[in-house]
Amino acid sequence: MVAGIHSLLLLQFYQILLSGCTGLVPEEGKRKYSESTRSSPQQSQQVLDQFELRLLNMFGLKRRPTPGKNVVIPPYMLDLYHLHSAQLADDQGSSEVDYHMERAASRANTVRSFHHEESMEEIPESGEKTIQRFFFNLSSIPDEELVTSSELRIFREQVQEPFKTDGSKLHRINIYDIVKPAAAASRGPVVRLLDTRLIHHNESKWESFDVTPAITRWIAHKQPNHGFVVEVTHLDNDTNVPKRHVRISRSLTLDKGHWPRIRPLLVTFSHDGKGHALHKRQKRQARHKQRKRLKSSCRRHPLYVDFSDVGWNDWIVAPPGYHAFYCHGECPFPLADHLNSTNHAIVQTLVNSVNTNIPKACCVPTELSAISMLYLDENEKVVLKNYQDMVVEGCGCR
């Protein structure tokens, strides 16, 4: 049961925020809201639940996420969020977000991350090779989303032992799509090479591999998902070089808290056909010089939505809240230029001055902008998504 103050805050949030979103709350819902202020606590809770469900649907969620306490947010997803929220620190060199990833996000408005299922057994080492099979459950990707790009990210640690710099200390990482799993009589699965990389042991960093063809085959073409094979080939026979520096599986000596931060990560970039891509900034109109106006006239008012106040901070990772603003005020006759009115609003206001049965023009948002949100979905998958029309940039009489 939601506490009384919590219910009031959430209902007020819906009333103000959704008042600027045409069609988001039907007239019946608005009537129920006004009636809820006079109804019993049980009826108020029902109205609250209906509002919450409608807003969750706007976010593309079927139910309110209830993530566990041990869910780890990949640092890479936080970097992406800060990048697209223009909140990165000046020193961007330490960020794992590179140009290639920014370009991938330029065609998407949604980024999803997936960890592999660790039930898969490691394929025994064969000579100079370490081979691991990975399976990622992608069932949480909605059918209406078009996956535009996908990356498999693997962490490699710097080798601490002294080594030569003549290029002999190299590993090759090959990523394969399992087209057909191994049959009982066959020697191994049928695979297709997706990407390959020659790496040195000289630094700790993430390596990104393009696996878009496999994800497209699984999602768009509805073909079976048998996972990937990651093959690490050691190009030298120096036993002093640890072969576990490429982190494709968890070692027994590794700290339990450290493994979730360096385990392999599959990242998909997709677009649901709504709004703009993540990297595209909607150009905001230049603010005109503020004219002296009546305090009661139509204008933008401050409204800060704090997700902890409405009880959503357990699944919304970032931002903790945002400035939504709202429009309120009179549209008096005659309509002044600074009220950003349409010709129809001017005519309607003129008619209202002689016939009060015709309502005045309304103070509504005339310009809205998007925000990026990083959250955990119903399946505890980390999602970064661009949501349109979340911030009021301008108001006018319409």
Curated annotation (Swiss-Prot):
List cellular component terms (GO): extracellular space
An example GO biological process term is: cartilage development
PROSITE patterns attached to this UniProt entry: TGF_BETA_1, TGF_BETA_2
Report the superkingdom from the record.
Eukaryota
Gene3D superfamilies in the record, alphabetically?
2.60.120.970, Cystine-knot cytokines
Which Cys-Cys disulphide bridges does the record give? C298-C363, C327-C395, C331-C397
Sorted UniProt keywords:
Chondrogenesis, Cleavage on pair of basic residues, Cytokine, Developmental protein, Differentiation, Disulfide bond, Glycoprotein, Growth factor, Osteogenesis, Secreted, Signal
The listed locations are: Secreted
Task: Name the residues of the propeptide.
Answer: 24-284
What SUPFAM superfamilies does its record include? Cystine-knot cytokines
Task: Write one Gene Ontology MF term.
Answer: cytokine activity
Q: Where are the annotated glycans?
A: N137, N202, N237, N340
Pfam families, from UniProt? TGF_beta, TGFb_propeptide
Q: Which residues belong to the signal peptide in this entry? A: 1-23
Q: State whether it acts alone or in a complex, and with which partners, per the record.
A: Homodimer; disulfide-linked.
Similarity annotation: Belongs to the TGF-beta family.
Q: What does this protein do?
A: Induces cartilage and bone formation.
What is the recorded name of this protein?
Bone morphogenetic protein 2-B
The record lists the organism as Xenopus laevis (African clawed frog)
